[in-house]
Amino acid sequence: MADHPIQGLMKTAMENLKEMIDVNTIIGDPVETPDGSVILTVSKVGFGFAAGGSEFGGKPAEKKSEDDETREQKLPFGGGSGGGVSITPIAFLIVGSTGIRMLHLDENTHLIEKILDAAPQTLERIQQMFKKNNKNQSQGQNQNQMNNMNY
């Protein structure tokens, strides 16, 4: 069976989209600054693709007179396809001698990252509270023992 005309449309559109896509689309090419830091752009990438077509009514299949085999007749076809790409920079990844930093362009949307950044400090505070609580309990037990000895 021959390829359907819409396959050609889809193949062409997908090949063109594929040419636009590479790893540098999301993580940009590194830029080195004079102080030795390296800056990478982090982008949000969105792709869209659509294809459609229609076959119009044609003549019914005809029989050959010599060997009575039916031959397939191609119906008239109309179709189209399209695609689009949206690339939006969302952050810069800065790698320098002081460490790695993520500089977001929209600070309001990164609540989870802020929570993760605060997690070590929060855990440390919780540990300190437990240590104080254990220390207070042990002091309270010692005080109770002392009170029991005095009676």
Swiss-Prot record:
The keyword Membrane does not apply. Induction: Expression is probably sigma F-dependent. GO terms for biological process: sporulation resulting in formation of a cellular spore. It comes from the Bacteria. Keywords: Sporulation. Residues 51-84 are annotated as: Disordered. It holds the Pfam family Spore_YtfJ. The keyword Magnesium does not apply. Residues 60-74 have a biased composition (Basic and acidic residues). It is found in: Spore core. This is Uncharacterized spore protein YtfJ. It comes from Bacillus subtilis (strain 168).
